[in-house]
C-alpha cells in the first residue's frame, strides 16, 4: 500500500479555514501538517519535507496594503527559493482564496505585472454559494471534474476579481491550458452576477502555472466536503466538489511518490 502523502498547510496571523483544510486532507487519505511561517524562519520545518502544500483562505496580516501581499513577502523572504524548487520538482502547491492571492503576489502563476486579483466589481464582500466548471485538462483534477458538469462551491471574498493588463494575457492563459475552473450557474459557465460573484474576466475562478502543479482558486472546496453542506443535490450518487478536490490532490501527491 502506498504511503499517505504529507501535505503541509501554510499559516500566518490572520489565516483561517486551516482546520477545514486539515480535515479535508486527512479524510481524503493524506497526512496533513500545519506549517506556521515562523516554523520556516526558525528552521523547525522545511517545505522540501512535504509532498504537497496548501495556502488556505483568510485575511493574512489583516489584508493590510492589499490581500495576500504581506504573507507573500514574508513567505518569499523565509522560503522563496525552497518554494520555487518545490514547484520546479513538480510537487502540487494549492492556494485557496487568500492563498490564491498569495500565489499571485509571489508570481508563481503568471507575471504579476500583467494579471492581478483586485476588488470585486460590487465593491463589497461577496459570500454565497455559486457553481464552478472545469475548463482545462489539468492533470491533478481532470479525472475528478473534467466533463462532469458544474459543481456547487462556496465563495467568500472582497478581492477576487481576476483582471489582466491586456487581452493577449488571457489568450496566452488559454493557449497554455491555465484556466482551470470558471464560475457557472446551475447549467453552464456564465458571466452573470451573482454566479460570477466578483466580475472576473471571462468568469475565471481558478488559474494554474504553465506546468499545472501550482493552482489558485477563489472558491472554498474545504467548505463543501460533505453532501449535507450542499444546497441540494440532484441524485443520491452526486458527489460534492470538496471531496473530489481533496481526493484528487491527495491521489496525485501519492502517485508521485510511486
Swiss-Prot record:
Main location: cytoplasm
Cell compartments where the protein resides: Cytoplasm
Listed CDD domains: GATase1_FGAR_AT
Tagged with keyword Nucleotide-binding: yes
Active site residues of this protein: 97 (nucleophile), 220, 222
Domain Glutamine amidotransferase type-1: 7-238
Catalyzed reactions: N(2)-formyl-N(1)-(5-phospho-beta-D-ribosyl)glycinamide + L-glutamine + ATP + H2O = 2-formamido-N(1)-(5-O-phospho-beta-D-ribosyl)acetamidine + L-glutamate + ADP + phosphate + H(+); L-glutamine + H2O = L-glutamate + NH4(+)
Xref: SUPFAM superfamilies: Class I glutamine amidotransferase-like
Pfam families: GATase_5
Alphabetically ordered keywords of this record: ATP-binding, Cytoplasm, Glutamine amidotransferase, Hydrolase, Ligase, Nucleotide-binding, Purine biosynthesis
UniProt-listed Enzyme Commission number(s): 6.3.5.3, 3.5.1.2
GO annotation (BP), single: 'de novo' IMP biosynthetic process
Keyword Nucleotide-binding in annotation: yes
HAMAP family referenced in this protein's UniProt entry, alphabetically: PurQ
Main function: Part of the phosphoribosylformylglycinamidine synthase complex involved in the purines biosynthetic pathway. Catalyzes the ATP-dependent conversion of formylglycinamide ribonucleotide (FGAR) and glutamine to yield formylglycinamidine ribonucleotide (FGAM) and glutamate. The FGAM synthase complex is composed of three subunits. PurQ produces an ammonia molecule by converting glutamine to glutamate. PurL transfers the ammonia molecule to FGAR to form FGAM in an ATP-dependent manner.
Subunit structure: Part of the FGAM synthase complex composed of 1 PurL, 1 PurQ and 2 PurS subunits.
Annotated protein name in UniProt: Phosphoribosylformylglycinamidine synthase subunit PurQ
Organism: Thermoplasma volcanium (strain ATCC 51530 / DSM 4299 / JCM 9571 / NBRC 15438 / GSS1)
